[in-house]
Amino acid sequence: MPVSEIMAGAALGLALQVLHDAIKKAKDRSLTTRCILDRLDATIFRITPLVTQVDKLSEEVEDSPRKVIEDLKHLLEKAVSLVEAYAELRRRNLLKKFRYKRRIKELEASLRWMVDVDVQVNQWVDIKELMAKMSEMNTKLDEITRQPTDCICFKSNHSTSQSSSQNIVEETDRSLEEIVECSSDGSKPKIDIHIHWSSRKRNKDREIRFVLK
């Protein structure tokens, strides 16, 4: 089966496995060029956990950045083609070997860049957790707004924290306040929503605040 057909329907993890197998075959054919191939194989081993996480998030998060995933697949497909072509070169063809070796080095650097995508992956997790919290909050707001407006005073403070083995998103402070001014014209309550959360892994704080009248 051609590499392009394998990559078309493959998850990123499977694409990495195809590349790993291609490197292994290339090293068996050319013992004198194992150094650059060992380096590329080590980079694949390093990014495999991250790629597995990207695969998982692409299935769970709606409207995930599909272009990023497709770009990574294309990069892995290119890597397989380079490695296979490099392995087929004859020993005497030094000029082509030099060119392919340089291209493999550049591609290996691009794959190492994928490690930096870890920051973006954590942001996807933060967004997923925030969407779940906002959905829960919207449900509570609907219940509140359906109540009568005759002198209702409601205040609730809630703090929760949730952690996982790879990402920890902590909601350090969430307050929902409804202040109702009783008047003769039957005015509706004012709702002040303030969400504050932080990521322990990246040590970043974020917050959202908006007011509904």
Swiss-Prot record:
- The keyword Electron transport belongs to this UniProt entry's keyword annotation: no
The residue stretches assigned to a coiled coil in this entry are 70-93, 125-147
**Membrane topology field:** Single-pass membrane protein
Which InterPro entries does the UniProt record give? Powdery_mildew-R_dom
Keyword tags: Coiled coil, Glycoprotein, Hypersensitive response, Membrane, Plant defense, Transmembrane, Transmembrane helix
What biological function has been recorded for the protein in this entry? Probable disease resistance (R) protein.
Q: Which family does it belong to?
A: Belongs to the plant RPW8 protein family.
| UniProt GO cellular component terms | membrane
UniProt source species: Arabidopsis thaliana
Q: Which residue positions carry a glycan here?
A: 157
* Pfam families (UniProt xref): RPW8
All residue ranges annotated as the RPW8 domain in the record: 1-153
Q: What is this protein called?
A: RPW8-like protein 3
Membrane-spanning intervals of the chain:
7-23
* Biological process, per Gene Ontology: plant-type hypersensitive response; response to fungus
The root-end lineage is:
Eukaryota, Viridiplantae, Streptophyta, Embryophyta, Tracheophyta
